[in-house]
Amino acid sequence: MSHFGDHVGIDPAIMKQYSEHHNGSHDNDDKDKEDKEKQNTEAVAAAAVQLDASLLASGILDDFEKAKKEEEEANGNNNASNDQQNASDRHVGDMLEQHSQQHQQSQEHDTSYINTYIEDKVPLTSVLIPGDRRVSDREASDRIAATTRRVRLRWTQEETADLMEGCKVHGVGNWKKILTDPRFRFNNRTAVDLKDRFRTCFPEDYRRLYPNARSRKFGKKTNVMAVNDDLVKVNRKERRVFTPEEDERLLNGFMKHGPSWSNIQRDNELGLFERRSTDLRDRFRNAFPLEYAAAGFKARGPKRRPVVEATHGNTLQTIFSASDGSEMSPRKYHRVQEQMDRQPVMRVHPQAPMDQGVDRDHMTQQFTQELQPQAHSRKQQGGDGLKEEVFAAAQNQSYNNYYYQK
């Protein structure tokens, strides 16, 4: 440092004073560091003493030292057998588990410090501390579900008889009352089980009482064991035509609930609960097609009827058109146009009522009589005219059957 002061021209006394101060500051830093380490060591020792005091007060430390001493003596004895060693290990584990449970019940000490101290001195093995493995929530729920899952039991004749008697007393549908009635005995059943059993034994009555239920189709094989011969089979409900009053109530229900057929069927003011929701929908579509289409549903289109005229020069778009004015598709137009180019259109009176349709048999007979002289003359000329005319007649008749339908 003095050489550096001489080189730069600094007073040696000042450099000496600076050097003493600099070395003293380093000594002070080292001293502070040693003091802090000493304080930390004393704090750790005090915490260990306090922890040992708490363990000693609870009795765990003495028992642990005693168990450890017994374990060392057992390990030092070379003549001891493996059975004695295992017994000693189990004894130590039982003692530790017992004291751990006692300490958890008391609220005087912190359990986390004790567990940390034990983990530092005792290896955590399955022999010393059995059953210490944590179980996940999913595994616990699976165990609970496995123990609480019910075993399905076959219905007996006594249970089925009690179910029938309960339906007579409380009525069909009051499954909770039937289940809780002390007069009837059921083997670990629920209200849903009673309902399912009734549906199995009486499928027709179930469909009548629950018209909107989507139940599976029952096969030919039935459970004969549970059904008694004394049961009275209810006659199936016959189909009834909708009356004008029902149509009016159906229209009012549509104005009130919209296209919600289930709500219309359950509305007590309308009185349509005897009808199914699908029946109400189909009836409304047929009776009120305009309102049905206005609601956004696809109504059934009008049937195509021929507009017949007696001339051959009319186009197909004029002869065959829908009542709503829509034209024929181009594909059908070209197919029929080719047939009309080969054969004339059937002669149908233009004033014939469309509701009566067309007498196809009479028209075919008349058409055949007109073709016979022409075919006979062509046959005499040596040509195959009869075969051609018969084929044309059959083709024209198929054309008539396809387009001239009622």
From Swiss-Prot:
GO terms under cellular component: chromosome, telomeric region; nucleus
Electron transport in keyword set: no
One Pfam entry name: Myb_DNA-binding
Compartment annotation: Nucleus; Chromosome, Telomere
The keyword Nucleus is annotated on this UniProt entry: yes
One function term, GO molecular function aspect: DNA binding
Comp. bias (Basic and acidic residues): 20-40
Chain residue ranges for the region called Disordered: 20-46, 368-389
DNA-binding region as annotated in the record: 175-202
Record keywords, A-Z: Chromosome, DNA-binding, Nucleus, Telomere
Highest taxon of the lineage: Eukaryota
Role of this protein: Telomere-binding protein that mediates telomere clustering by promoting formation of head-to-head dimers of DNA molecules through the telomeric tracts. Binds specifically 5'-TTAGTCAGGG-3' repeats in subtelomeric regions.
Identification of the protein by name: telomere-associated protein 1
Organism encoding this protein: Yarrowia lipolytica (strain CLIB 122 / E 150) (Yeast)
